[in-house]
Amino acid sequence: MAQAIDASKNSPSDPRNREVVFPAYRDPQIGDLETPINSSPLVKWFIGNLPAYRPGITTFRRGLEVGMAHGYWIFGPFAKLGPLRNTVNANLAGLLSALGLIIILTGALTLYANSKPPKPVKSVATPNPPEAFQSSEGWNNFASAFLIGGIGGAVVAYFLTSNLELIQSLFGG
């Protein structure tokens, strides 16, 4: 058994002996690695289509999309897993909690924007970081749009959850 293992370690044709992790762009000075995950076309496509990295959209729209998604999904855990989960006011408590967290997150984004953040670094997965994240003004625009989108996303989730029976009756469910 040990002899077979030693034989496979020394065989260049064995696929387990192939290198799969390389320095980014084959330059070890960059300090990033290309792995089969972060350099695959599927992952690059997925990350490139996220609102933060999608080319051709404004800073305000980036913040609005990210805020709407966060407001929408933050509502659920507060409403359905919070301490008031089995009460009549569970959805309202979830909405208010989600709004509070969105406001805290917006404050954190604003603080970051005012701290003179460094310019984004080009990486394997994001070879072209957007211009929006290269200035304090861009980050402030992103933060204000995040607040609007976050509030909107949480309110939409609240109305959908609170009126679930009505929505189901409209669609025959």
Curated annotation (Swiss-Prot):
Major location (coarse)? membrane
| Pfam families the UniProt entry points to | PsaL
- In Swiss-Prot or TrEMBL terms, this protein is called Photosystem I reaction center subunit XI
InterPro entries given in the database record: PSI_PsaL, PSI_PsaL_sf, PSI_suXI
Which family is annotated? Belongs to the PsaL family.
Biological process (GO) annotations? photosynthesis
> Which NCBIfam families does the entry link to?
PRK00704.1-4
Keyword annotations of the record: Membrane, Photosynthesis, Photosystem I, Thylakoid, Transmembrane, Transmembrane helix
Residue ranges spanning the membrane: these are: 92-112, 142-162
